[in-house]
Amino acid sequence: MIKRIAQTAGFTGLLAALLLTLLQSLWVAPLILQAETYEKAPATEAVHEHGPGAMTGHVHDEEAWEPEDGWQRVLATTGGNLVVAVGFALMLAGLYTLRAPSRTSQGLLWGLAGYATFCLAPTLGLPPELPGTAAADLVQRQTWWVGAAASTAVGLALIVFAGNWLLKLQGAAIIAVPHVIGAPQPEVHSMLAPEALEAQFKIASQLTNAAFWLALGLISAWLFRRKGENGQRA
């Protein structure tokens, strides 16, 4: 079983990471590069002078290493995506041991659940941001993000698997808790990039992550079932 999980996660993570990198390179990265031109423009130096804590999420360190545009950035992005994709694929394969998909298409439902948990729900309070956008304290944002993802995971599990309607309602309430509390916000809302570019970036990020999660769910379900069938024949 461990071999089955590892093989499923490895191949799924590799394919999903390559897909994510391709979509990011073609759609998301150009928007980020365009936003960086506004952040680095000399005319915007005065815009950087915000009130205390207004830009705590974007402190710049000229000495910090950053991958250069081109192959370095693509390679760094691919490596990061691979680690994340394999980790999520391991999670899905582990869940399949508890409730194995009877059809490959059920992997799409698991992918949708992953997208809702780790992307959609957290970004309702903390939408993806371009460089030069004001943000709240990093630790506070990370804490809220983890809480939103955990609440969504528990809530969805109760809604889908609980047989009691009261538990299903409790699941919906659990999902809503972090959003009722509210995500941490900066003292002053400001951004250097145009609003139209920000809107394009949010759409691109959501659709790219949706494609990633659907691919992750579909491929992992197919591989998990295939490995199981091969094991039974052996």
Predicted regions located by residue number:
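Juxtamembrane/disordered regions of integral membrane proteins
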Residues: 1-234
